[in-house]
Design a protein with these regions (language model features):
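Non-transmembrane, aqueous-exposed alpha-helical and coiled segments at domain scale
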Residues: 1-298
């Protein structure tokens, strides 16, 4: 391995360690604004108290430089890798895994990762195929963008997939998303962000739903038809009355984001992925020389 590659791998490792902790401690400003707006919009006495408690929790985390939630989740990374970035993806993955482990040990953070059958804890939030990394490759570019989205179990357990048929149409999509959120109730710690993935294949629809929750709160899909669906779903979901923490109220979700892909003419896969109120995310941009810039959304 070249000296440049060694230095880059260490830079990625350091970025991953910092991103994981940053995401867990400091929620994004757009999320803070969404929670504040929710507090103003909520009319239920219980709902208002829940939202006030959530916002006070965030203030205490800021004051004490501590975690906003005890569930440190599974570390999920989204990587945009330039074609000319000098470090091979295998080295990037190795660094992301080592960075996650370093953050867990040095902070220390609660370790959640276990073997799926024995349930034995791996000890440092890493394990077989963990952390989870999603890749996107950019032709002609020499940089690397890394986004860390820690995902807790309460919200991840409320994930849904349905293979609709084309005849179900847009109304079928709406019915399924609405039914999913009603079934979830208060389990995913609402109000949060609902991610919807439409199209592709079964696995890709789930991927798109997860990608949707990683966007800044309230951003809209560039496709006007999809953006319209986001607005309609957002309104419908807040008519359920589930409310903050499932205790009733006006605000069930902070927003709904939809990502889509073209699909087979006889398919209509739809997936739902819920993100809890904490909606943690943090990003970094690395240059070919290892220089690193930390941003909320790289």
């Amino acid at each position: 391995m070249s000296t440049t590659a060694v230095g880059l791998e260490e830079a990625v490792l350091d970025a991953a360690a910092r991103l994981y902790v940053w995401a867990l401690k400091d929620i994004p400003q757009d999320l803070r604004d969404a929670l504040a707006a929710a507090s103003e919009r909520e009319t239920s006495v219980t709902g208002i108290r829940v939202l006030e408690t959530i916002r006070r929790n965030v203030e205490i985390a800021d004051e004490q430089q501590n975690l906003v939630c005890q569930d440190t989740g599974i570390a999920v990374y989204y990587c945009r890798v330039g074609e000319r970035f000098p470090l091979h993806p295998a080295g990037i993955y190795r660094a992301l895994k080592a960075g996650t482990e370093r953050a867990t040990v040095e902070h220390p953070l609660r370790s959640n990762t276990v073997h799926t059958l024995t349930r034995e804890n791996t000890g440092a939030n890493v394990g077989y195929r963990v952390p989870i990394v999603h890749w996107d490759f950019v032709p002609g570019w020499d940089g690397l963008d890394v986004k860390c989205v820690p995902k807790g179990s309460g919200s991840e357990n409320m994930s849904f997939l349905k293979m609709l048929v084309p005849a179900d149409g847009v109304n079928g999509i709406k019915r399924f998303v609405l039914a999913s959120i009603v079934e979830a109730g208060g389990k995913p710690c609402p109000p949060g962000i609902v991610g919807v993935g439409i199209g592709g294949s079964a696995d890709y629809a789930l991927h798109l739903a997860k990608e949707a929750i990683a966007r800044p709160v309230g951003t809209r899909n560039p496709d006007p038809l999809v953006a319209q669906l986001e607005d309609e779903l957002y309104g419908l979901l807040n008519e359920t009355g589930i409310g903050p923490m499932g205790l009733g109220g006006e605000v069930t979700v902070l927003n709904c984001h939809v990502e889509h892909a073209d699909t087979h003419m006889t398919l209509n896969p739809v997936a739902v992925n819920y993100q809890c109120w904490a909606a943690r995310r943090a990003s970094a941009h690395l240059g070919a020389d290892g220089s690193t810039t930390f941003e909320r959304d790289a």
